[in-house]
Amino acid sequence: MTRISREMMKELLSVYFIMGSNNTKADPVTVVQKALKGGATLYQFREKGGDALTGEARIKFAEKAQAACREAGVPFIVNDDVELALNLKADGIHIGQEDANAKEVRAAIGDMILGVSAHTMSEVKQAEEDGADYVGLGPIYPTETKKDTRAVQGVSLIEAVRRQGISIPIVGIGGITIDNAAPVIQAGADGVSMISAISQAEDPESAARKFREEIQTYKTGR
């Protein structure tokens, strides 16, 4: 296994769907399947917060979501659980600034995809130095899904990172909908991530498809 190329990573970040069982009222596995069918390019298993599954139920959901990803040919990323990621032979892991040390995680996971959330220029540079394949920058917009988020910062950090000539793949995180995704890509991000914009949509497949079409248009047009 070799590390993913930056070009491939930038493509995969286009429509980055993140979801746990508690982010939808529908059957979570079905929602993941529909999002993938609609065109999600990457999926992150994020089972956190109130009503989150634990123990065997959590592992079973992860396995089913991973199977859906395999069937769709979409990489399966685990949020902040190196042990689970390694046990499942996931395609990658995503960690926040309050989670494990990125350099140590890189050493533990080998060539798997490593994503790191960053909120400042120094955190972006540190993530790149530590071996991150991409950074998640945000929160771009206000969000209800994550209760522990930092101050909303819009697209200013994305623009600043690109102005400095830093080419690490970037995905925008936080409060992104089909109506406000364009500025994120125009600022220099390679994709957008979303939870509720797909997980709580009446038709997750259609919602994912709209994101895929819009993001491709924005990326082509800049």
From Swiss-Prot:
UniProt KW keywords: Magnesium, Metal-binding, Thiamine biosynthesis, Transferase
GO CC term, one of those recorded: cytoplasm
Textual note on the cofactor: Binds 1 Mg(2+) ion per subunit.
Pathway in which this enzyme or protein is active: Cofactor biosynthesis; thiamine diphosphate biosynthesis; thiamine phosphate from 4-amino-2-methyl-5-diphosphomethylpyrimidine and 4-methyl-5-(2-phosphoethyl)-thiazole: step 1/1
Cofactor: Mg(2+)
Gene3D superfamilies, sorted: Aldolase class I (3.20.20.70)
Binding annotation for 4-amino-2-methyl-5-(diphosphooxymethyl)pyrimidine: 44-48, 79, 117, 146
Positions with a binding annotation for Mg(2+): 80, 99
Protein EC: 2.5.1.3
Role played: Condenses 4-methyl-5-(beta-hydroxyethyl)thiazole monophosphate (THZ-P) and 2-methyl-4-amino-5-hydroxymethyl pyrimidine pyrophosphate (HMP-PP) to form thiamine monophosphate (TMP). Is also able to use the 2-methoxy analog MeO-HMP-PP, as substrate in vitro, but not the 2-trifluoromethyl analog CF(3)-HMP-PP.
Record-linked PANTHER family: THIAMINE-PHOSPHATE PYROPHOSPHORYLASE, THIAMINE-PHOSPHATE SYNTHASE
Additional information: Thiamine phosphate synthase appears to proceed with a dissociative mechanism (SN1 like) in which the pyrimidine pyrophosphate dissociates to give a reactive pyrimidine intermediate which is then trapped by the thiazole moiety.
The family this protein is said to belong to: Belongs to the thiamine-phosphate synthase family.
The name this protein goes by in its record: Thiamine-phosphate synthase
Organism: Bacillus subtilis (strain 168)
